[in-house]
Amino acid sequence: TVAVEKSMESMINLDGATLMFPTSFGYFDPHMLKEAVKFPAVQFSHCGGLWQEGENPKNTGSYFGYIDECQYLNGIAAGSTTKSGKLGFVAAKPIPQVLRNINAFTLGAKSVNPKITTQVIFTGDWAMPVKEAEATNSMIAQGIDVVTCHVDSPKVVIETAERAGIFTCGYHCNQSKLAPKGYLTGAEWNWEK
């Protein structure tokens, strides 16, 4: 939105910021890219953006944490727990960082049982609670007994799975309190270190 651009401009013009971290997925294009053109002396780094060398301004870039390594471990836990051999993954969009997480989760599970399958349902956006619940319920109806996700509102997936009595692996932060019976483990961010 225009408010995002105004906030960045305020940080640059009033506070003297020379390095910007606009972290929300939707901030990358067009907002960060527009501001980078306006302020070529400021470096813009976007968490998870779809930055491409040679196509985006030289003062822009992107970064992302290696949470797919944690998703691999989630997959091992899921693969060791499933009775059906069917796992589920509720995801927002088919972009590289999400696909890395899906692949890592599946490879982790297959390291325990090569016959395991992972069904993926994309909701289309980062926070779609109704679609996330529908996707989880659809997977449960198909006999999937462990689910995980890559969405901004994992609480919905975790709570839906817990109510249905299946297992979950969390994402973003510790959600074990949401699913005391079915929470196996989770891929959690720790930006402090």
What would you call each of these model-derived segments?
Residues 1-193:
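A residue-level marker of the well-folded mature domains of exported/periplasmic proteins
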